[in-house]
Design a protein with these regions (language model features):
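Chalcogenol-based redox active-site neighborhoods
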Residues: 1-172
Length: 172
């Protein structure tokens, strides 16, 4: 599966349940302020895949204050259950909410790759999405490098969206 959305596309409307029990509509939430959404697998994964997800979450948690001070909201999403999310968020002492996409509606809509082991389905590798206050995707980071993640996201939300080559030729 490849990403179905790209920079310049609107973030779709999809409902997700948070670790605090709150139901979030992704589209409505991002139109309040710029936002960063990390799709990850970790709570119920094992091995290298779990480490990738956990490292991405740790990087986002470490950069949370910088993002918040810049007025950027932060959330993370996995396909685990609300209870698994709550347990993971508590054990990691995360400063932001996790959202459960247990039905996989968001990952399917966005085209985020998943892996299955029996009934356990997880995000295959972390994917970060930066969305501006108009609900427009500014960046999709499919190969998350934890050390550079926060800088990449902040840069994506501070720079104008580049004009696509085909758009540039039609506007002349």
């Amino acid at each position: 599966m490849s990403m179905k959305l790209a920079p310049g596309d609107p973030i779709p409307s999809v409902g997700l349940r948070a670790t605090d029990g709150y139901l979030l509509n992704l589209r409505s939430w991002v139109t309040k302020q710029p936002a960063v959404i990390l799709f990850f697998g970790a709570p119920t994964l094992a091995g290298a895949a779990r480490r990738k997800g956990a490292n991405a979450i740790e990087a986002l948690a470490a950069g949370f204050d910088r993002l918040r001070e810049a007025g950027i909201a932060v959330a993370a999403v996995s396909t685990d259950s609300e209870q698994q999310q709550t347990d993971f968020a508590t054990s990691q002492k995360l400063p932001f909410l996790l959202y459960s996409d247990e039905r996989r509606s968001a990952v399917e809509m966005l085209g985020i790759e998943t892996v299955a082991k029996g009934d356990n389905v997880n995000v295959a590798q972390p994917v970060a999405i930066a969305v501006d206050r108009d609900g427009i995707i500014r960046a999709v980071i499919e190969r998350v490098e934890p050390v550079a993640l926060v800088d990449q996201l902040m840069r994506a939300l501070s720079e104008p969206i580049p004009v696509a080559a085909e758009d540039a030729t039609t506007s002349s």
